[in-house]
């Protein structure tokens, strides 16, 4: 029986994946933003569209997906963009669909989880601290050379990153964050080129990998 694949894309992308699902004989459902309703999607490869608002509460998305699952057998849930990884992981766990859940998904989106996982595996990374316990932050800033970089844990690329040159500047910024402080990680700034490797792994074997260099130098204010 053909698989039914629910694809999530809150940005306009993923055409080739959608077409490949169709070529593979899958039933393809697309969950996207209301504002993308009239976008030039590969409509001949999509069986049905469903729409959400960017500010829709997570609970409402869960309820909507559960309602959809009353009539659709959801075999797979696929995120087509970085910003959709967490939503897809949440829905997989809630609907008990195969694939990585929220804990595993955080290792791909949460900068704190990424660094913790890398350090525990012995992979070199800049010194860092979770913006959570103030005593731990004070201890960290007393021993780690400046400048530092304050990063949102779940944004993509350089969005929301701030370069900090003093403890007083840091605490002023932390105060403005209020209850959102724990959504950030603080790390030592190390100037240099930034590379990343995109890969596909199947049955624990790397079947595709490509290395890229960031177009924006980390020597910049936001890098």
Predicted features by range, described:
Residues 93-160, 167:
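A conserved helix-loop-beta module that forms one wall/lid of the active-site cleft
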Residues 49, 128, 184-186:
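Generic structural signal for residues in well-ordered beta-strands
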Residues 1-104, 109, 135:
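ATP-binding N-terminal substructure of ATP-dependent carboxylate-amine bond-forming enzymes
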Residues 28-29, 125-126, 184:
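Hydrophobic anchor at the start of a short beta-strand
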Residues 67-74, 142-144, 178-180:
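Glycine-rich phosphate-binding loop signature in dinucleotide/nucleotide-binding domains
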Residues 169-173:
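Short amphipathic alpha-helices within nucleic acid-binding modules
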Residues 177-183, 189-223:
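Phosphate-binding core of ATP-grasp and ATP-grasp-like enzymes
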